[in-house]
Amino acid sequence: LHARSSLAPERAFYFLKTVKESPVPFAEWSAYTVSFHESESVEVMQFILRILRDLLLLRVGVSIEKIQLKRYASELSAIVLQWPEDEIQQGIKAVEEGLEGVSRYVNIHLIWDYICLTFLQGRGLY
């Protein structure tokens, strides 16, 4: 793994915290990602997907021992109740579509806008 990979988990958890708790989530996330290279964005999106899939498993009652990101069990346990199943599923769909957009050479900032706005709709902000 190259050096940037180690930032993906931290950035992914920061994304979820931002879209859930920030008073200005869209502006905050847009400013945070402005200097990301496309490869960094893809790594963060992939990690967000992994987090969301594990959160979904936890929401439906799967034990913490069976999740993929065991290393982040405490972080996942701390946020799982903030994320209803429907928001998680919406988020998974948005990130998967975002990654599809990357493969079709859509501008990465537009993809982040789409993902962020989808999460904010789940929060009831848009």
Where do the protein language model's features map onto the residues?
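Charged, glycine-rich active-site and insertion segments that engage polyanionic ligands
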Residues: 1-47, 51-126
